[in-house]
Design a protein with these regions (language model features):
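Active-site mouth of glycoside hydrolases
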Residues: 1-95, 100, 104-112, 131-135, ...
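Substrate-binding clefts and catalytic carboxylate motifs of secreted carbohydrate-active enzymes
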Residues: 34, 49-53, 70, 108-214
Length: 214
């Protein structure tokens, strides 16, 4: 997910990423957002797999962040609230969520809330015969073999281990599967080919998961 709508990493890098400038919505737009956000929570309230509500992603349509976060926490006090995943950051809610590509980076920290890396990675490998589009694919970095993808993943994971010691509480890799023209999945778009060395990926992931069990 890029703030420019997916038109390319160059524009993503130039985007004003966390300057705190929320959108100014019309009264009708705000009312529609509030209505639909409440409907989403009402519909998904009983799903035990949902542990965090995220009102905004990467500043898309983000507005009145502290107010929306406060309402969400009061409406469902049983769950954590991540005010904006990779968006304009405010000192509200339970989580400070950073996005960084391709490798992990801890460029902001909050000692009160959980500091998480909500997105990183994007290691691309286009595998012919398993693509959504045959000739238009991208990743933040691109490789040609499973060995190269695995080695790059492990390199990022090793760096992540260092950042966990400095303050990260969680991290989310982009992404599990290819998504349309995004070929940065660990598995192809058709779910037929795993593009990495499974035992090596499992080993480094377990090392990360157990890194705080000391």
């Amino acid at each position: 997910d890029m703030p420019n709508g997916g038109r390319g990493p160059a524009e993503w890098q130039m985007h004003k990423y966390y300057d705190g400038a929320d959108a100014i919505r019309s009264a009708a737009s705000e009312a529609n957002y509030r209505k639909e956000w409440k409907e989403i929570i009402d519909y998904l309230y009983s799903y035990p797999s949902i542990g965090v509500w995220v009102p905004f992603n990467e500043a898309w349509g983000q507005f009145k962040t502290p107010e929306i976060t406060k309402w969400t926490k009061e409406y469902d006090p049983s769950r954590l609230v991540n005010p904006a995943s990779g968006g304009n950051h405010y000192t509200c809610g339970d989580i400070l969520d950073l996005h960084n590509y391709p490798g992990p980076n801890l460029y902001l920290y909050d000692p009160i809330r959980a500091t998480v890396l909500g997105e990183y990675g994007g290691i691309g490998m286009a595998l012919k015969g398993h693509l959504w589009l045959a000739d238009k694919n991208w990743g933040y970095v691109k490789f040609n073999t499973p060995e190269e993808v695995t080695n790059e993943y492990i390199k990022y994971a090793d760096h992540l281990l260092e950042l966990i010691e400095k303050g990260f509480s969680a991290a989310v890799y982009t992404q599990i599967t290819d998504v349309e023209e995004e070929v940065n999945g660990l598995v192809t778009y058709d779910r037929k080919v795993i593009k990495v060395d499974e035992p090596k990926i499992k080993a480094i992931n377990q090392k990360i998961c157990n890194s705080l069990n000391k």
